[in-house]
């Protein structure tokens, strides 16, 4: 049986790892063992952060909606409660976009939410 030499495959594997690790600092872009280790970590971080990105954007949208809602004298919590009571089904991504780009439309939604809110039981009688 013929002897199998792995030189070509090994070089191809090493070259692909080193090409993928271009841009890393120091030894991590030049030495195969360091590059392989860094590549493993990099792919792990990328996988983790693709999932974390969804929560990060949701936090950003909520912060933007809250800021715009407070400009209209209502908190984020009461605003969302009012929208649900009114049956308005606009997601947070679109609400945040409205808050940034179209303040008048957002103010209209705030008015709808305020109208749909139940009267506060603990509010002082006027």
From Swiss-Prot:
It comes from the Bacteria. PROSITE patterns: RIBOSOMAL_L20. One of its GO terms (cellular component) is ribonucleoprotein complex. Keywords: Ribonucleoprotein, Ribosomal protein, RNA-binding, rRNA-binding. One of its GO terms (molecular function) is rRNA binding. GO terms for biological process: ribosomal large subunit assembly; translation. Binds directly to 23S ribosomal RNA and is necessary for the in vitro assembly process of the 50S ribosomal subunit. It is not involved in the protein synthesizing functions of that subunit. Belongs to the bacterial ribosomal protein bL20 family. This is Large ribosomal subunit protein bL20. The lineage of its organism: Bacteria, Bacillati, Actinomycetota, Actinomycetes, Mycobacteriales. The gene is rplT.
């Amino acid at each position: 049986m013929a002897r199998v030499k792995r030189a070509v495959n090994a070089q191809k594997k090493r070259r692909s790892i080193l090409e993928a690790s271009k841009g890393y600092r120091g030894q991590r872009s030049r030495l195969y063992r360091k590059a392989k280790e860094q590549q493993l970590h990099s792919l792990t971080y990328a996988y983790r952060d693709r999932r974390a990105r969804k929560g990060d954007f949701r936090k950003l949208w909520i912060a933007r909606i809250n800021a715009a809602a407070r400009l209209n004298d209502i908190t984020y919590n009461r605003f969302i409660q009012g929208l649900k009571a009114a049956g308005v089904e606009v997601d947070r991504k679109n609400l945040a976009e409205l808050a940034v780009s179209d303040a008048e439309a957002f103010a209209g939604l705030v008015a709808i939410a305020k109208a749909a809110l139940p009267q506060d039981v603990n509010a002082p009688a006027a």
